[in-house]
């Protein structure tokens, strides 16, 4: 579903974690990182156990140069993934955190 269609649903009063995740993912894919981060932040406010949303939130923040905020999102996402047994998200988030720790070349 397009971000336009999802935005229309939001404007009609639908607002939930899945809708916000869809918007965040759509905007992230479109390189609209600030909008992506806004929707993904709302997503994790709806559902703090949504490890995939924490992962994407970290990406959106990192793409804006907000590495400290990205690290915080990924660390929270890693905690959630480990608590839920979400091994795939945990592995992906661990890779992002390691990349963040590497010095820039």
Residue ranges and their predicted role:
Residues 12, 46, 63, 80-84:
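Structural marker of alpha-solenoid helical repeat scaffolds
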């Amino acid at each position: 579903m397009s971000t336009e269609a999802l935005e229309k649903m939001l404007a009609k009063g639908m607002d939930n974690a899945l809708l916000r995740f869809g918007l965040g993912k759509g905007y992230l894919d479109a390189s609209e990182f600030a909008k992506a981060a806004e929707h993904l932040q709302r997503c994790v406010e709806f559902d703090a156990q949504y490890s995939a949303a924490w992962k994407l939130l970290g990406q959106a923040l990192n793409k804006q140069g907000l590495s400290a905020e990205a690290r915080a999102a990924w660390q929270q996402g890693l905690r959630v993934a480990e608590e839920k047994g979400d091994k795939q998200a945990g592995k992906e988030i661990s890779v992002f955190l390691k990349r963040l720790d590497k010095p820039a070349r």
